[in-house]
Amino acid sequence: MEILTFIIYLITFFILFDFYKKNKRYSKSPNKEANGPWSLPIIGGLHLIGDRPNRSFSELSKIYGGIYKIWLAERMLMIVTDPEIIQDIWIKQHDKFVNRPHNITSQIFSLNHKSLVFGDVDEWNKVRPKMTCHFTKIKLNSTKPKQIVNDQLKKMLKIMTTHSLDSKPFNQYVYLNTYSMNIILGLMLSIELPHSNSNDKDGQFSKVLHSIDEIFKSIGTNGPEDIFPTLLPFFKNRISTFTNHLNVIKDFIRSIYKQQIKTFDINIEPRNIMDCLISEYYEDDDQEDEVAKQELIIQLCIDMLVAATDTSASTLEWFMLFMINNPNLQEDLYEEVVNVVGKDCPYVTFDDVPKLALIKACYFEILRIRPVTSLSLPRVSMEDTTTLNDIFIPKDTIIIQNIFGMGNSEKFVSNPTVFNPSRWLEYKKMKDLNQFGNRDDSIDTTNTTTNTTLNGTTSKYYNDLERVSIPFGVGKRRCMAPSMADHNVLIAMANIVLNFTMKSSDPKQMPLSEEEQYAITIKPKYPFKVLFEKRS
């Protein structure tokens, strides 16, 4: 009986202490403490977060402001839904927030935090220069990358034509991912995977694609193994499943590496990015052994393959959905393309794309209303610090950039839930007239224009779309290759509308739901298939 009483007292003490820890003030000055909801013992604010954290965090920002704190089980988070605070944390104070938070999923994925995506600052500083040089605008505008994109796009257009002639629904999940994956595989490894299951030897492509999808779900949704690390032994099956999916991708890349290292010649021009990495790592004078270098090269390739495949494919899937729901806009895009390239032209080139203002506006609007990485990847504060208005941020706080929340907030965008590409055309006109002031990537509180007052709240960033729509993040650890995404998606959009009319394969679904399914990249919540009609 005494033992039972002791256990009850112990549990009660733990619950009370945990409640106190999660709700106490961390700043010595009460008015400098970040707002936030009350957190419960053990779970913190998990009960406030549904299956779409991007939506939940955005709703909470309406109550608690542009930066607020919330506990998810054992970790304190601060959610930032304010462009000025984002500029301060992610750019001005970059060095204090450069690291990613550690959890079991990121640790397994990243060779114990040595990768480009999840690497700690020292490792990240080593590997980033080796990768970014391959994805500059100059490199992407060179002949080989353009040739790879054109080749893959023409193959996809051919498949679309076949589907249109047969009136067969198009499985955009498979074919868009094939298109995106083959571009990055061509750049990295000089290979491509088959566009049809009949040519998929041993189902290898399907396995890799499925594993990439599962990896994204695991990383993006913060499973219980990450939220409750003290209960890790109870989640061995989940960790094992994640590891198995990662190994499918690793084995695929490793098999290519072993083939390529046999024919690698440092005296000839690199054939692809893997050749460049092999050359750079084996010329380094560091003490890493050959196996460690091999694994790091494979890891960097995985980083790019996983990130580049899903983001471009998801953006194109959203494009198809919004075109089906907006047939008049679809025709406007067609007219624009025809006016630039001519009605008899079968293919839009890279040189044509800069002339397609409405196509680009449509692309930017998709990334605003459904940014594929809606919460970006989190950072962690490396020391006690403050942000604007002296709001205190304790050391080891996870910081989340609410990209979705800013682009979909009435505080920053007029009619934010409406898909309206023309807002970007108007924005460009306003920007050309310098209506938003002279701003660079640092915080600028001068020469800014207060655009409107909404619900009593004045925002100098209202409808300043490039400031409030940041689909690739900001700062040094933003998406490494936004130019590549622009290249791959814009030319695909233009050629699809030039050659086809898009409709839903099931008229009963119309209009298609524009709700999203949350993961590290967001996708349409409800499956749909596209019916292509070939334009005459």
Curated annotation (Swiss-Prot):
Protein name as catalogued: Probable cytochrome P450 520A1
The cofactors it requires, by name, are:
heme
- Membrane-topology annotation of the record: Single-pass membrane protein
Q: Where are the transmembrane segments?
A: 1-21
SUPFAM superfamilies this protein is in? Cytochrome P450
User: EC number(s) of the enzyme?
Assistant: 1.14.-.-
Q: Which compartments is it annotated to reside in? A: Membrane
| Assigned keywords, A-Z | Heme, Iron, Membrane, Metal-binding, Monooxygenase, Oxidoreductase, Transmembrane, Transmembrane helix
What GO molecular function terms would the record report? Answer: heme binding; iron ion binding; monooxygenase activity; oxidoreductase activity, acting on paired donors, with incorporation or reduction of molecular oxygen
